[in-house]
Amino acid sequence: MRQLSTQDADFDSQLTELLAFETVNDATLLTTVDDIIARVRHGGDSVVLELTQQFDQHPATTTQALELSKEALAEAFANLDDVVKSALITAATRVKTFHERQVQETWQYEDELGNRLGQKVTALDRVGIYVPGGLASYPSSVLMNAIPAKVAGVKEVIMVVPAPKGVLNPLVLAAAHLAKVDRVFTIGGAQAVAALAYGTETIPAVDKITGPGNKYVAAAKRAVFGQVGIDMIAGPSEVLVYAEGEAQDRADWLAMDLLSQAEHDRIAQAIFVTTSAQQLKEVAIEIEKALAELPKADIARDSLKNRGVLILVRDREEGMAVINRVAPEHLELSVDHPDALLNSIRHAGAIFMGRHTPEAIGDYCAGPNHVLPTSGTARFSSPLGVYDFQKKSSIIYCSESGSKPLAQTADILAQHEDLEAHARSARYRYQ
C-alpha cells in the first residue's frame, strides 16, 4: 500500500493518478452495451430470455418463468433464521424512519398581486431497482432502494436481480418482501437495464432506474438516460478515513475500517489521511496483520495495492483540503470532536462522525441511504433518497387583476427577445 505526504514534490500528480478511474468509457464495452440495448428494445422478451440464458446460465425456458411470485418472496422471509429476520427488520425500520423525514410536500403562497404560486410534488408512477445478484448478493441494497421509493409514494417498484444458474440468496428475496417490492425478475446486466427502460411484453417500462451494478450495468444506465431517469453512474466503492493521532485512536480499528472497503472489490479504494506520522506507521502494520487472516485477503490486498493510499498531512487544514479534493463516497472522521470538522467538509457522500461510527453501520442499519455518489461526484451529487422518487411541477395561477402588471412586464421582455407572439399573448391580458 503506497504512502504519500503533502510535502512530496509530486503529491498533487500522485493523488490525481490515484483518483483517476473510469470504467464506462471503454469503447468495446460501450459497443457491447449498445448492441444489447438495441436487441432488447426490438426483440423484447425473447432477447431478454436468450441473454439471461447465455450470460447467467439461467434454466428458465420462458420470460414468465424469470418472474418470482409474491408467495416465493413471502416464503423466503418466513424461512429466515429468527436472528437474521430480526436484524433485517431492524435495518428496514431504521431506513424507513430516516427516509420519512425526507418527504417533500406540495406548497403554495399568494403574492402581493393576489396571484397564487407554488410547487406540486408528485411521486413517480413506476421505478426499477437493480440489485446485484448471486449467492454473494446484498439484501441491504434492496432495502436502500425500495424503501425510499415506497416512502415517496411510488405506485409500483420493479426489482431486477441476476440469478446465476437460477440461484439466489434467500435473504435478497426476504428483503424484497419486507420492502414491499411489487414485482421481481431474475435478470441482470445491460439486458435488465434495457428491459426496464423500454419495456418488453412481460417486463413493464419504468420511469427511473436506481441501484448499483457492474460496469455493464453502469454503462447501460448511462446509455438509457433520457428515456428514463437514473440515480447515478456508480463507480467502485471508496472510503476515506481521517484521524489525528489522538490518544483514543486504535490503529486496529482504523485498519479494519479501511479493509472493510478494500474487501468489496479489487478496484475499491481505501484512503487513510492523518496528521501523525507515527499513526500512519501503526495503521500500516495493523493492515498487514489483518490481511494475514481475513477471508477475502486476496481481494483486499489487490485493492490496497492498486488504489489504496496512506496520506500524511501537516495539519488539519491540509487534511480538510485533501478530503474535499477526493470528495469521498464514505468519510470517517475518527477524531475526539468530529462536529468541529463538519463545517469544513464540503464534499462527501456520507460522513461518519467519531470513532464509534464505522462505515459498516451505515452500510446496513444506521438509516441513511448507502447508495452514495462515487468517483468524486459527491462534489455535485447527493445520496439516494425519497427526493429521487418524487418530481415537482410549478403551480402558477394569476387572477384577472394580478395578471395585468405581470403581462406588461412579459410583453416588454418578449419584444426584446424578438418573440412577437409571446408579446401579443401577454398584451391581450392587460389591454
Curated annotation (Swiss-Prot):
It catalyses: L-histidinol + 2 NAD(+) + H2O = L-histidine + 2 NADH + 3 H(+). The active site is at residues 329-330. The keyword Zinc applies. GO terms for cellular component: cytosol. It comes from the Bacteria. Its cofactor is Zn(2+). Its EC number is 1.1.1.23. NAD(+) binds at residues 130, 191, 214. Keywords: Amino-acid biosynthesis, Histidine biosynthesis, Metal-binding, NAD, Oxidoreductase, Zinc. It holds the Pfam family Histidinol_dh. Binds 1 zinc ion per subunit. Zn(2+) binds at residues 261, 264, 363, 422. Disulfide bonds: none annotated. Pathway: Amino-acid biosynthesis; L-histidine biosynthesis; L-histidine from 5-phospho-alpha-D-ribose 1-diphosphate: step 9/9. GO terms for biological process: L-histidine biosynthetic process. GO terms for molecular function: histidinol dehydrogenase activity; NAD binding; zinc ion binding. Substrate binds at residues 237, 261, 264, 330, 363, 417, 422. Catalyzes the sequential NAD-dependent oxidations of L-histidinol to L-histidinaldehyde and then to L-histidine. Belongs to the histidinol dehydrogenase family. This is Histidinol dehydrogenase.
